[in-house]
Amino acid sequence: MAIEGVLNEGFVTTTADKLINWTRTGSMWPMTFGLACCAVEMMHAGASRYDLDRFGVVFRPSPRQSDVMIVAGTLCNKMAPALRKVYDQMAEPRWVISMGSCANGGGYYHYSYSVVRGCDRIVPVDVYVPGCPPTAEALLYGIMQLQNKIRRTNTIAR
């Protein structure tokens, strides 16, 4: 059924959960936490070729204005407290995308003494984007997977 047929009737019915989740998926504002070479691919995804703005994804410079954090690159032990602090400053509900092999599990530097073996040891991760570095298409797919996850969540407690 097309939307034109629904609007001719004069009303649309839905649940509050679906409406709230629809608005959340259409206006995701990520906080960029670029730590290494994966950040270049993240910038590439935000540029004109892939244009994340068409999905409602607008990069924000402040954690208080964002609801998604994209951790892109190698997370060192010295940077881990800053990552947690920025995550704690984000408003609820908040989601995390781990981008790249280094953010997912330490990557090439897994056995280094100064590298955290996955950002999921510091913050809860919702979507993992594999690759070294992952392509802009992979990040775009990860964002769409996060949108699907948000659509499936129950917003209002039952």
Curated annotation (Swiss-Prot):
InterPro entries per UniProt: NADH_UbQ_OxRdtase-like_20kDa, NADH_UQ_OxRdtase_20Kd_su
EC numbers: 7.1.1.-
PROSITE patterns given in the database record: COMPLEX1_20K (PS01150)
Catalyses which reaction(s): a quinone + NADH + 5 H(+)(in) = a quinol + NAD(+) + 4 H(+)(out)
Subcellular location: Cell inner membrane
Residues the entry annotates as binding [4Fe-4S] cluster: 37-38, 102, 132
Any one GO MF annotation of this record: iron ion binding
Pfam family, one: Oxidored_q6
Gene Ontology BP, a term: aerobic respiration
UniProt keyword annotations, A-Z: 4Fe-4S, Cell inner membrane, Cell membrane, Iron, Iron-sulfur, Membrane, Metal-binding, NAD, Quinone, Translocase, Transport, Ubiquinone
Principal location class: membrane
Top-level EC class as recorded in UniProt: translocase
Entry superkingdom: Bacteria
Entry cofactors: [4Fe-4S] cluster
Its membrane topology: Peripheral membrane protein
SUPFAM superfamilies recorded: HydA/Nqo6-like
CC terms in the record's Gene Ontology section: plasma membrane; respiratory chain complex I
Entry note: cofactor: Binds 1 [4Fe-4S] cluster.
HAMAP family: NDH1_NuoB
Biological role: NDH-1 shuttles electrons from NADH, via FMN and iron-sulfur (Fe-S) centers, to quinones in the respiratory chain. Couples the redox reaction to proton translocation (for every two electrons transferred, four hydrogen ions are translocated across the cytoplasmic membrane), and thus conserves the redox energy in a proton gradient.
Annotated family: Belongs to the complex I 20 kDa subunit family.
Subunit structure: NDH-1 is composed of 14 different subunits. Subunits NuoB, C, D, E, F, and G constitute the peripheral sector of the complex.
UniProt-recorded name of the protein: NADH-quinone oxidoreductase subunit B
Source species: Janthinobacterium sp. (strain Marseille)
Gene designation: nuoB
